[in-house]
């Protein structure tokens, strides 16, 4: 009886341990969900939701070359200085490197900057890392694709 109890307890602890280890591993699906959430939150101007998935060290490089940190990027969204139309990520590809993922693809951009509309197609890359607080985006970079002449 004791052996069955101890065996059951041991298996239970093993499954609990394995479950907690799995929860901490970054997957392609988790990284892509993070990128899709970013697109949704930015496109809807939801800066408060965006703060939950951006790492404190977040760096945002715009297609224009402008580089902003987390505070600057969120501040422009909150103030209304920058308003994005809904963003749909396309051609999404993800590569895993341990607890880090690089998510790439393209999107059509429509944004109002201080009331002036700007639009175009961009390639993007996100760097997503697994942290003790869950997956976080540490970097975003857009590269404008010039229209064919």
Regions inferred by a protein language model and the residue ranges of each:
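A solvent-exposed, acidic/Ser-Thr-rich amphipathic alpha-helical stretch
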Residues: 26-29, 46-97
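Short beta-strand edge/turn micro-motifs at domain boundaries
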Residues: 121-148
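Short, low-complexity N-terminal intrinsically disordered segments enriched in polar/charged residues
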Residues: 12, 18-56, 149
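Hydrophobic pocket/interface hotspot
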Residues: 38, 49-50, 58, 73, ...
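Bacterial N-terminal signal peptides that target proteins for export
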Residues: 1-9
């Amino acid at each position: 009886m004791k052996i069955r109890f101890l065996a059951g307890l041991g298996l239970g602890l093993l499954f609990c341990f394995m479950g907690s280890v799995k929860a901490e591993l970054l997957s392609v699906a988790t990284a892509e969900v993070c990128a899709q959430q970013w697109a949704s939150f930015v496109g809807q101007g939801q800066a408060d939701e965006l703060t939950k998935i951006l790492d404190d060290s977040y760096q945002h490089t715009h297609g224009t070359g402008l580089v902003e940190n987390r505070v600057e990027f969120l501040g422009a969204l909150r103030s209304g200085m920058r308003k994005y139309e809904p963003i749909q990520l396309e051609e999404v590809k993800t590569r895993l490197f341990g607890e880090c993922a690089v998510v790439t693809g393209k999107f059509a951009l429509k944004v109002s900057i201080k009331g002036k509309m700007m639009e175009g197609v961009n390639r993007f890359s996100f760097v997503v890392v697994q942290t003790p607080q869950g997956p976080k985006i540490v970097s975003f970079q857009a590269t404008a694709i010039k229209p064919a002449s």
